[in-house]
């Protein structure tokens, strides 16, 4: 499947391990992983950042193979899940940064065009999340209040 607003096909990706069980060399228990996930979430890290830290620093290749559930499910169980999904949050953050840039550089036509593309992506993603009930049905993206969502 191709990219939304560019020409790339996006075919490169890392291969997931075939074996879905926990590696034999891993000595960490699922309770330890749960506690560390909660600790990192309380520090303000996103689920993907938590996964990267667990992989790189703690040697946990896949949280799902160790605990049986994904990072976001663990965060939801402990009440630490973000209210806005992570990918939507980063798109809103990008739109706020582009708007801030456009306040200083009014004639930047390319940034104006890119802002339109980013905001259309936000609207499309918000429609999906409303349909899957990850966002409330009355949630709406507005460029005037977007900076408060990201701050």
Swiss-Prot record:
Keywords: Ribonucleoprotein, Ribosomal protein. InterPro entries: Ribosomal_uS15 (IPR000589), Ribosomal_uS15_arc_euk (IPR023029), Ribosomal_uS15_N (IPR012606), uS15_NS1_RNA-bd_sf (IPR009068). GO terms for molecular function: mRNA binding; structural constituent of ribosome. Gene3D superfamilies: 4.10.860.130, S15/NS1, RNA-binding. One of its GO terms (biological process) is cytokinesis by cell plate formation. GO terms for cellular component: cytosol; cytosolic small ribosomal subunit; endoplasmic reticulum; nucleolus. This is Small ribosomal subunit protein uS15y. CDD domains: Ribosomal_S15p_S13e. Belongs to the universal ribosomal protein uS15 family.
């Amino acid at each position: 499947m191709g990219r939304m607003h560019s020409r790339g096909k996006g075919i490169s990706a890392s291969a997931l391990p075939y074996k879905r069980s926990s590696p034999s060399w891993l000595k960490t228990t699922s309770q330890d992983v749960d506690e560390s996930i909660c600790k990192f979430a309380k520090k303000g890290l996103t689920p993907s950042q938590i996964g990267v830290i667990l992989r790189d620093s703690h040697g946990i290749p896949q949280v799902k193979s160790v605990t049986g559930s994904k990072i976001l499910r663990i965060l939801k169980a402990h009440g630490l899940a973000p209210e806005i999904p992570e990918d939507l949050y980063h798109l809103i953050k990008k739109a706020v940064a582009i708007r801030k840039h456009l306040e200083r550089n009014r004639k930047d036509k390319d940034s104006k065009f890119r802002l339109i593309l980013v905001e259309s992506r936000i609207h499309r993603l918000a429609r999906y999340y409303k349909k899957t009930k990850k966002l409330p049905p009355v949630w709406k993206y507005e460029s005037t209040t977007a900076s408060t969502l990201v701050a």
